[in-house]
């Protein structure tokens, strides 16, 4: 049986990724200028990684037969509806940076010999990769070339 602390930590990580900004943006697409569709694909890629991580964590949590709470999207996300891809990619960079800091903090609470530690570190690795991809996508932005 998973210790309650680790269960709560994994539930928090699953919730952070299940109701993440990239996931929200798969439902409320930003405005994309013609020719920038390839840059917009990064949103779907990040959201897919978040979904896969949540699925992996849920397999562990569901075996515990305890209630799982993933929550709702934050209402603040609606402020980003219909904004440009350039702006959204910058917001996603800030979001992923905050997520990375949160995950690094959470990693300090977890026993290094646990499954939770492996999943937290997987989430950290994903966040680092997402930040690299976002930096590249933001570098391709016409707004960043002025």
Q: Where in this protein do the model-derived segments appear?
A:
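N-terminal leader/targeting helix
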Residues: 1-47
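Carboxylate-rich helix-loop segments that flank metal/cofactor sites and access channels
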Residues: 55-94
């Amino acid at each position: 049986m998973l210790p309650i602390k680790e269960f709560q930590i994994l539930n928090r990580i699953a919730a952070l990724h299940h109701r993440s900004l990239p996931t929200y943006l798969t439902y409320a697409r930003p405005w994309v200028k013609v020719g920038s569709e390839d840059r917009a694909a990064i949103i779907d890629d990040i959201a897919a990684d978040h979904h896969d991580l949540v699925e992996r964590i849920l397999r562990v949590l569901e075996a515990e037969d305890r209630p799982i709470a993933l929550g709702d999207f934050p209402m603040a996300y609606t402020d980003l509806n219909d904004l440009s891809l350039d702006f959204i990619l910058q917001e996603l960079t800030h979001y992923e940076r905050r997520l990375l800091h949160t995950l690094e903090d959470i990693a300090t609470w977890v026993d290094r010999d646990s499954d939770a530690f492996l999943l937290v570190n997987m989430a950290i690795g994903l966040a680092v990769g997402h930040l690299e991809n976002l930096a590249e996508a933001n570098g391709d932005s016409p707004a960043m070339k002025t």
